Amino acid sequence: DDGGYAVADHRTIRTDLGTMDDLADLTATLHAHGISLVMDLIVNHVAAEHEWARRARAGQQKYRDYFHILSTQDEVDAWEKNLPDVFPDFAHGNFTWDDDCQGWVWATFNEFQWDLNWANPDVFCEFLDLMCVLANRGVEVFRLDAIAFIWKKLGTNCQNLPEIHDITQSLRQAIRIVAPAVAFMADAIVGPDDLTGYFGRGRHWGKVCDMIYHNSLMVQLWSALATRDVSLMETALSRTPDKPSTTTWATYARCHDDIGWTVDDADARETGLDPVAHRQFLSDFYSGTFPGSFARGLVFQDNPVTGDRRISGSLASLAGLESALESDDPAGVDAAIARIVMLHTAILGYGGVPLIWMGDEVGMLNDDWQRDPGHADDNRWVHRPMMNWSMVKQAHAEPHSVPGRIWNGVRRAINARHRSPEFHASVDTVVLPSPHRKVIMWGRPHPEGRMIELYNISEHEVWFPMETLRSELDDVVTELL
């Protein structure tokens, strides 16, 4: 079921987890503790077992129109000409033949996930009604999964098309009439040029999504760690357009998914890098095949046509902790812990809503995902483990243990953020020119004071010129960490 992303019924809960009434009880308990529930809403597709798909197979035209069903191979070929493969290893192509429908059904991700036809107003109304139902159960944030794929236009790659923002703004306006506290979070893991469109540009400014994953920040952090050079990161983040003051980033270093190297070609060339070669280097480095690499990752979806090779792996294993522990290398362990803490401090320090993937705060390593036959064909499960609560207990009881050192480092950064008004979401982060290629520097200008942050992405001590800081700071300086 693609890890839960093939939804057969939007209005019921998986029976082993509970009921819709249990969901309402959960959200009430969370609200009482100041926690908002974020729910994935998979807007691009439904499971082939969904009632809409079953009715389409039964020949009901109303529901056939919920999907993109093509009659001939020539039609398929015309669309496929411009469409990339998302999962080339196990789901080649974007269409699947269905005998009952007697047609080719659009299925971007897997043959069991049928893409919805958002040009059909009935699909829009179905999802608006669903949002109202779930909001009445206490859901406050909808993570719009695969939002970048929902509009189809012949002759394009059918990603990031402008009609997406028309649809999203319309959904947002409608849901806020009945549930004004609801927020939208865009799952748009796209290139830097397309990313901020999901906040809204032009007439959509500030009227689309309230939060977006800062995919570019995540990619640039890992790129800088591999190269020990912040030049590309400085260039890429400096070009990030301003966002509406009513929106914010969701910052992260790892999540449930693979890492795709969305490095802009122009950014790479400006810093003297060949973009194709650099993406290949990053895949080699984080899969552990590059000489001297500290990482233990896995290649996910090797596409020989495009050269795209994404990476799976837990944050700690990608940051070098697994290899250092296995080789009994204390210095390597120290360096890996420093990387892990730095990554978390950076996502906390950039502003926005930091997302910490479960287990990363104590340094959980790659999971033995192949033991589960249902996961063996998808190595993304290497970073989707069951929580290791014994590591949490160790982190609290033994501050000098590896989990304890990581946890205390992350907690120190969290506490510093809590004390600092400069992290208000309306404040933009400004990347500043750094005189040292191993140190990224950014600032957060706030009416109560200007914050400057420095991140050393190398294993080595760096001497940083004090005059650079004096030119950016006020007379009275406070160190937060």
Predicted regions located by residue number:
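Active-site and adjacent substrate-binding regions of carbohydrate-active enzymes
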Residues: 1-481
